[in-house]
Amino acid sequence: FLPCYLNRQIITLLSTLGVEDQVFETIQEERITLLNGLLNERFSAVEAIQASYAGECHKVVVEMLVAGYARNREPFLSSMLQAFKAAQVYQICKRSRIFIPNGRVLMGCLDETADLAYGEVFIQISASDGSLSVIQGNVVVAKNPCLHPGDVRVLVAVDSPNLQHMVDCIVFPQNGNWWCVFHI
């Protein structure tokens, strides 16, 4: 899976649509706090790296942390954590790239079973441990690239037994108006 980041365009559109700037600032502050604990707290380091799915080379770092290697005594581990933190802080400060912990970048597909109603979507995501979970409730869906306020929608994620085989994608309905498929 790919983690979700808000970029300048999406932040601008969400702000235009009424999302308070304080929301973005709070998310940024929480991320900076987590990154500051990266070098001092093992749990923060593992959580930050796993959540952002930093790539294959960082799996080794997570395995070393879980195995109990000391961050301040292992030069490779320390340098990898510092590089990860520097890259993440750079993304936040210079590119306004805000990590969304519960967000995902998903490919959209059509509900061939015709189970979903207009305004509903089906989302089932996988975790790093291989477990699956179905998302339910209101979700914010944005097209990429996101250039127009209509590219951001709030839809309702529902469970559908006939779509359980669909993983790490967002399933749009074939019923009703096609705006939520063609405009997203």
Functional labels for PLM-detected ranges:
Residues F1-I184:
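Core mixed alpha/beta domains of very large multi-subunit molecular machines
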